[in-house]
């Protein structure tokens, strides 16, 4: 969790109070503010399995992506550069898409896949 905390807080600049809930068994979590009412929460996988009562399975980066929509091609480049500097693995460098947008993909320290994307039809 410390590596992910550092990545999201120090590398990507997301606001957080750090890791809280350490006093509880299976309770350690860090919340990052994304926008009003929307937060990213990071937990240890064992703790998620315990809390949800689901069997822990092998991680797969292709289960889902987290989309980070921005307002310009330049902003895609900036976010991707910040992620790389923070330790992300760039899986697809920023590029023009077949549908007229611009995007790139990276994996965070835990292997979660992010797409940073500009859609010319959306106002951000």
Predicted features and spans:
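Short, charged, solvent-exposed linker or helix-capping segments at domain edges/interfaces
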Residues: 43, 52-54, 116
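Short hydrophobic-acidic sequence motifs that mark active-site Asp/Glu residues
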Residues: 39-41, 65, 113
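Non-catalytic surface loops within mature trypsin-like serine protease
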Residues: 36, 46, 70-72, 108-110, ...
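Core segments of cupin and vicinal oxygen chelate
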Residues: 1-47
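A short, acidic/glycine-rich surface segment
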Residues: 25, 47-54, 123-124
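Vicinal oxygen chelate
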Residues: 30-34, 53-124
């Amino acid at each position: 969790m410390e590596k992910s905390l550092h990545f999201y807080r120090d590398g990507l600049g997301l606001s957080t109070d750090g890791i809280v809930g350490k006093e509880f068994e299976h309770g350690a979590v860090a919340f990052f503010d994304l926008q009003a009412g929307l937060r990213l929460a990071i937990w240890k996988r064992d703790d998620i399995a315990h809390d949800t009562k689901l069997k822990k399975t092998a991680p797969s980066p292709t289960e889902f992506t987290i989309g980070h929509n921005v307002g310009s091609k330049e902003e895609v480049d900036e976010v991707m550069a910040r992620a790389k500097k923070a330790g992300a693995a760039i899986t697809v460098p920023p590029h023009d898409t077949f549908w007229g947008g611009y995007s790139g993909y990276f994996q965070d320290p835990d292997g979660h896949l992010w797409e940073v994307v500009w859609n010319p039809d959306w106002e951000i």
